[in-house]
Amino acid sequence: MPLFIVETSCSLISWLFLYLLLCHLNSGRDSEWNCRLVTLFHGILIICLTAYIGFIAGPWPFTHPGTENTYFQILTLVLSLGYFLFDMAWCVYFRTEGPVMLAHHTMSIFGILLALGLGESGIETCAVLFGSEITNPLLQARWFLKRMGCYDSLAGDVVDLLFILLFASVRIGVGSRMLYCELTSPKPSLIVKVGGVAIYTLSWIFMVDIARFACRKTCGKYRRWKEQYKLDGVNGHAVKIK
């Protein structure tokens, strides 16, 4: 336990140091800009680490849930735990996120603590982290495009489309398969299975919000296209009369 506290504290301090360093280097930017950079770095790092764990180091999470944690899994989980503690504290202090996102962070923290405390189910926890973070770079890119005034462009449309497709296919599609394997396997403990159901339910809450956003954006673009089409028709008719 003392070693775990030291490791988690080192992880938390490392993320805090990175944030403070970015604040120093980007003094012209606000705190959220620098926090988003930390979030982006964490997302890319965890995607790479969990992809290596799942696809190369093994074991395969769909066939071996509930197995004993490996050193590399523990390292990845501790790194991510430190980040979520940092980001949770930052979000609460600056009041930038709503209850759903705070619930996601809380579940992530407890899920990682559970896997580390039990000494097992690290592989499926890493798989969940991979699914959660795979859309993170796109989410941050969307925010940065908005801040730079470039969101209402082809780049913004591409980022949104890729985000929706990735979220639906990985977090909902692959996530459904992962949850099924978790629930049907006799190895994972009951509390881990309950946690898996909770995370999956939260993913569906996000999915409903994303679907509503997609409908609003599509309808808005269609209305603007129709208005532009009518305007072009009127202008063309006026030219013919002249």
Swiss-Prot record:
Protein family: Belongs to the TLCD5 family.
TLC domain location: 28-219
Lipid bilayer topology: Multi-pass membrane protein
Coiled-coil spans in chain: none
Keyword Cytoplasm (UniProt): no
Alphabetical keyword list: Membrane, Transmembrane, Transmembrane helix
Transmembrane residue ranges: 3-23, 37-57, 74-94, 109-129, 154-174, 190-210
Subcellular localization, as worded in the UniProt entry: Membrane
Protein name per its UniProtKB record: TLC domain-containing protein 5
SMART domains: TLC (SM00724)
Annotated GO CC locations: membrane
